[in-house]
Amino acid sequence: MRVVVIAIGRLKQGPERELAERYRERFDDLGRKLGFRGPEIHEIGESRARDAPTRIAEEAAAIAALIPDKAVLVTLDERGDSLDSAGFARKLGGWRDQSTAQAIFVIGGADGLSPELRRKAKLSVSFGAATWPHQMVRVMLLEQLYRAATILSGHPYHRA
C-alpha cells in the first residue's frame, strides 16, 4: 500500500525537517517489509489570498488534484478522532490487508481544511485538543506511521 502525506506549507531546513526525514526513512525501511511504500511527501505552498475562505478553497483545490478516486483519505484535524498508537496501527494494517492501493494523509494550513475534504475523509485524526504548528503535525504523523509499522511488525520500539 502506498502511503502519501500531503501538507500545506513547506518545511525549511532545520531540526523539524531532519526529524521528519528520519521518521520517513525509518517507515520506508521497515514498511517495505510489511507491504507499505513511502511515505511520499507532497508540499503545497500556502495560499496568499486575502481572506480565509478563499485560502481554504485554493488549498483544497490543490490538495484534491493530488488525491486519486480510490485512495483512502485521512485528514489531520483538531476535530478528528483521538486514536492511540495501537488503534492507528490497526487502521493502517486493516487498509493494507484490504488491498487498499493508497492511504493519503492530509495536513491543512493555518486556516484548516475545507468542509468538503473533511467530508470525503474515511478517517479524521486529532493529535489532541491543542492546536499544533503544521511542522510539528508532520513530524508527529511520520512518527506515528513509523510506530504503527513497528507495532505491526512486533518491533520493540512501541512499549505500551
UniProtKB/Swiss-Prot annotation:
Protein origin, superkingdom: Bacteria
InterPro entries per record: Alpha/beta_knot_MTases, RlmH-like, tRNA_m1G_MTases_N
MF term (GO), any: rRNA (pseudouridine-N3-)-methyltransferase activity
One Pfam family this sequence matches: SPOUT_MTase
Family of the protein in this entry: Belongs to the RNA methyltransferase RlmH family.
Keyword terms of this UniProt record: Cytoplasm, Methyltransferase, rRNA processing, S-adenosyl-L-methionine, Transferase
Positions in coiled-coil regions: none
Organism: Rhodopseudomonas palustris (strain BisB18)
Principal EC category: transferase
UniProt subunit comment: Homodimer.
Record-given protein name: Ribosomal RNA large subunit methyltransferase H
Chain's role: Specifically methylates the pseudouridine at position 1915 (m3Psi1915) in 23S rRNA.
Chief site of localization: cytoplasm
Family matches, as HAMAP family: 23SrRNA_methyltr_H
Subcellular location: Cytoplasm
Recorded catalytic activity of this chain's protein: pseudouridine(1915) in 23S rRNA + S-adenosyl-L-methionine = N(3)-methylpseudouridine(1915) in 23S rRNA + S-adenosyl-L-homocysteine + H(+)
Binding-site list for S-adenosyl-L-methionine: L76, G108
GO cellular component assignments: cytoplasm
EC number, as in UniProt: 2.1.1.177
